[in-house]
Amino acid sequence: MMQDATDPAVRAALQSQPSGLNSTDDWRQVMDRIMSLTARNPDAFRQQPQANRLSAILEAVVPARANPTHEKVLAIVNALAENRAIRPDEAGLVYDALLQRVARYNSGNVQTNLDRLVGDVREAVAQRERAQQQGNLGSMVALNAFLSTQPANVPRGQEDYTNFVSALRLMVTETPQSEVYQSGPDYFFQTSRQGLQTVNLSQAFKNLQGLWGVRAPTGDRATVSSLLTPNSRLLLLLIAPFTDSGSVSRDTYLGHLLTLYREAIGQAHVDEHTFQEITSVSRALGQEDTGSLEATLNYLLTNRRQKIPSLHSLNSEEERILRYVQQSVSLNLMRDGVTPSVALDMTARNMEPGMYASNRPFINRLMDYLHRAAAVNPEYFTNAILNPHWLPPPGFYTGGFEVPEGNDGFLWDDIDDSVFSPQPQTLLELQQREQAEAALRKESFRRPSSLSDLGAAAPRSDASSPFPSLIGSLTSTRTTRPRLLGEEEYLNNSLLQPQREKNLPPAFPNNGIESLVDKMSRWKTYAQEHRDVPGPRPPTRRQRHDRQRGLVWEDDDSADDSSVLDLGGSGNPFAHLRPRLGRMF
């Protein structure tokens, strides 16, 4: 026993034993030791902090794992002290220094080992990637050599040709178990993923050289299809999954073939449950023929019948909202006189938030449809708003809004040959109008004599004015009164006749153009208007005599009693009421 005590390892083990619990202690002693943390009051354990109680309970029930590092360091220090390498008072300092050094260098070694491990893993992954890409790198070099032999530009379909070459590069890069190599003057692409398949790239591009951008008719594509070789078809089939509808135009023949191949490859995976069900049904019916089974599968997978479109209708709540929108929009249009778009916005603002929140999709779709209808065809929008029984068309429910186009009112849009062959009733009306025009022309020929009877001294250019009697009264002398028209002249006066339509819509469809030409012909420049204004007439002999005698005021332009019925607009209109100085003497 004394020999064991002199052993540094045994002594270190004895020195490192904890002063608390041992594995050989009884549970009663363990509980007594835990409860007797306070020697004076055993019941004070429950008054200890929760962390202290929890730590003591855990350590008593499940002891901590022993770490032999400090025991080994302590054994080394005891051996050094026995061999007198260190003094006993230096044992504690050496023990602490050794523990710190072990902790420091052990952690450093762990980090170094981890760094080395990470570096080794990265190097292994890099080597694996390089080993896998050795074949693809060689294939890319061979592919670039092949593409260097091909022309960079083609006569037509340049965009399709460029996208096809890009898809070929992508296929060579991404497809595993494939390679591009040269054998003689030709280049080949070989893949062994799903069976060994080899494509002669040189012959395939030579065959496709004249087909880039070719647009074959939809009905007959057999003429173009006969130009493709099986080698070219295989290349199109292999490259189809690496293209999309935007890379190669679907209008071209090659784009159409790529689309068909892509859809066929995408639908090649048949649901096994469907296959098993059809197989079991065929066997139950006694049809063991493989051909009939394939025919059934082809019918079920390819001949899919279209479903009849469902009939849409409004429920009671949606119809109530529709009627409310119709009434509100019509009220805003008639009361405020706003535009249809503003009326719809006012209706949306005045809508109850609860009703809008519960029917938001329908209200948004309805407002969108009405806005489009108001912009495309205002007449259709007005009829839809004012019709209390109006219901949206089927396109309203599916999202494809169909609003009939509005009629712009151009008469030439509705012209046909029947317009220029008038009906008998139209001919009768034309004859009556021709007679009326002849009577008006006779009246215009007779009008200058009536002007002379009225005593008008108007210029010759004023005879064509539409108001000859008015001009005559304005330009006549102030000493004579105008003569009243007779009964026949009064009835035949052109001013009292109803306005004659210049162009009839049934017989003259370009009525708008004729009216525009008529308006433009009546336009005059400023110089023409200034030239046509009649100047002041020289005073007559009697007027000069009266002014010399001082019987007429200088600023009096219409002082005669005979000018009461004068329609002139110049001078003092009440000058005839002013007393005359000449009559007072």
Swiss-Prot record:
Stretches the record annotates as Disordered: 1-24, 438-475, 528-573
The entry's keywords: Capsid decoration protein, Capsid protein, Host nucleus, Late protein, Phosphoprotein, Viral genome packaging, Viral release from host cell, Virion
Keyword Phosphoprotein: yes
Modified residues (Phosphothreonine): 274
Prosequence residues removed at maturation: 571-585
Domain of life according to the entry: Viruses
InterPro entries for the chain: Hex_IIIa, Hex_IIIa_N
Localisation: Virion; Host nucleus
Alphabetical list of Pfam families matching this protein: Hex_IIIa
UniProt induction comment: Expressed in the late phase of the viral replicative cycle.
Phosphoprotein among keywords: yes
Segments for region (Peripentonal hexon-tethering domain): 1-106
CC annotations in GO: host cell nucleus; viral capsid; viral capsid, decoration
Post-translational modification as stated in the protein's UniProt record: Cleaved near the C-terminus by the viral protease during virion maturation to form the mature protein.
Site (Cleavage): 570-571
Gene3D superfamilies according to UniProt: Pre-hexon-linking protein IIIa
Positions of post-translational Phosphotyrosine modification: 490
Annotated spans, Binding to hexon-linking protein: 138-251
Recorded family membership: Belongs to the adenoviridae hexon-linking protein IIIa family.
HAMAP family xref list: ADV_CAP3
Miscellaneous section: All late proteins expressed from the major late promoter are produced by alternative splicing and alternative polyadenylation of the same gene giving rise to non-overlapping ORFs. A leader sequence is present in the N-terminus of all these mRNAs and is recognized by the viral shutoff protein to provide expression although conventional translation via ribosome scanning from the cap has been shut off in the host cell.
Purpose: Structural component of the virion that acts as a cement protein on the capsid exterior and which mediates the interactions between the hexons, including the peripentonal hexons, and reaches all the way to the penton vertices. Two hexon linking proteins IIIa, one from each facet, stabilize the unique edge interface between a pair of facets. As the virus enters the host cell, hexon linking proteins IIIa are shed concomitant with virion acidification in the endosome.
Protein name per UniProt: Pre-hexon-linking protein IIIa
